[in-house]
């Protein structure tokens, strides 16, 4: 009996120690903090969507080559970024932007994002429904939900990393565990489809960030959830499809996006936003051509390279691949020029 008790006690201690090490000790806190309810809420179809009618301040400490900064994220009742609190969506907009943090306006006030600048340059009303960590898949889904706003033009800001994000079941995040999102998968017949998120990664992140696991039961259940999230992230990354499948996924989602945009009477402009001056993946222009049906493509890599050659202001945040204030101005100017030339509004 004593031996059995000793075994049970030892096993319990080992289990608790394993949870502590795997779910807490080795999960490093992100080099950022937030004041407010957070920018995202869980969504069963997409995984995460912008938190509507909210205000969150994001705070980033100084690092070796970058000063500390913070920025405010205000959203309207649909989750679109806006300039201040209490704003509601209009019944319709001339222009809608979708994409990831490059379009959302990471590190900037909404008024300084290329979406807001583009609206001012074109004299058009604009709603920015981009979201940090999104790929093409989630952008298409959120776009579809909001096409009742009847935009005349939809601008999708694509980056090279969306090829990976489209097939990842865990979105990029600050934590070493899964932030579950929708993603392209393939059925038994080899046909692509959009699979829903597997679990609630938003709750997992929010509980961990807030430290809301002080009770013994909460500590154990959240710890188990984090361990699952770490294992699931590792498992999915090890099963990542190759480049051919990633290109197939991109074409599949862009076709869906263009089809719903065209059916609504709008036009779709896909804009490639270079990260650290790198141009688009080789497959992207061919994918756009295959999608056809009026889709337009603008590669802004030459504009960024020209700005660099001419000694213009740094279009990137120092120590980061995201566009700076100058970068967003460059993007807005390039898109506005193209839209005017092609008569897209």
Role assignments for model-derived ranges:
Residues 159-295, 300-313:
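Serine-dependent acyl-ester chemistry module
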Residues 104-186:
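Conserved SGNH/GDSL esterase-like catalytic core that processes O-acyl groups on lipids
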Residues 93, 123-125, 149-154, 262-269, ...:
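Loop/turn elements at helix/coil->beta-strand transitions in domains of secreted/extracellular proteins
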């Amino acid at each position: 009996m004593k031996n059995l008790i000793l075994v049970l006690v030892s096993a319990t201690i080992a289990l608790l120690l394993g949870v502590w090490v795997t779910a807490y000790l080795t999960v490093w806190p992100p080099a950022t903090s937030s004041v407010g309810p957070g920018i995202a809420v869980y969504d069963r179809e997409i995984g995460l969507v912008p938190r509507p009618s909210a205000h969150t301040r994001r705070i980033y400490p100084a690092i070796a080559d970058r000063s500390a900064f913070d920025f405010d994220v205000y959203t309207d009742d649909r989750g679109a970024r806006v300039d201040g609190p209490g704003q509601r969506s209009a019944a319709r907009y001339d222009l809608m932007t979708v994409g990831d943090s490059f379009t959302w306006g990471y590190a900037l006030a909404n008024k300084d994002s290329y979406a807001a600048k583009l609206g001012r340059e074109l004299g058009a009303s604009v709603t920015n429904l981009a979201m940090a960590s999104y790929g093409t898949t989630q952008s298409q889904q959120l776009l579809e939900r909001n096409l009742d706003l009847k935009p005349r033009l939809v601008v999708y800001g694509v980056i090279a990393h969306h090829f990976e994000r489209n097939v990842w079941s865990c979105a990029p995040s600050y934590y070493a565990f899964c932030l579950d999102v929708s993603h392209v998968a393939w059925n038994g017949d080899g046909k692509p489809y959009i699979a829903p998120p597997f679990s609630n990664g938003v709750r997992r992140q929010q509980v961990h960030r807030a430290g809301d696991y002080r009770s013994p039961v909460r500590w154990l259940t959240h710890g188990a959830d984090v361990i699952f999230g770490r294992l699931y992230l590792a498992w999915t990354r090890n099963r990542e499809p190759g480049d051919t499948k990633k290109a197939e996924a991109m074409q599949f989602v862009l076709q869906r996006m263009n089809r719903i945009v065209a059916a609504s009477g709008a036009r779709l402009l896909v804009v490639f936003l270079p990260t650290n001056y790198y141009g688009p993946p080789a497959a992207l222009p061919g994918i756009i051509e295959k999608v056809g049906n009026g889709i337009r493509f603008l590669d802004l890599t030459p504009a960024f390279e020209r700005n660099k050659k001419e000694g213009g202001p740094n279009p990137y945040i120092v120590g980061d691949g995201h566009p700076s204030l100058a970068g967003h101005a460059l993007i807005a100017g390039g898109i506005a020029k193209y839209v005017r030339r092609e008569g897209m509004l």
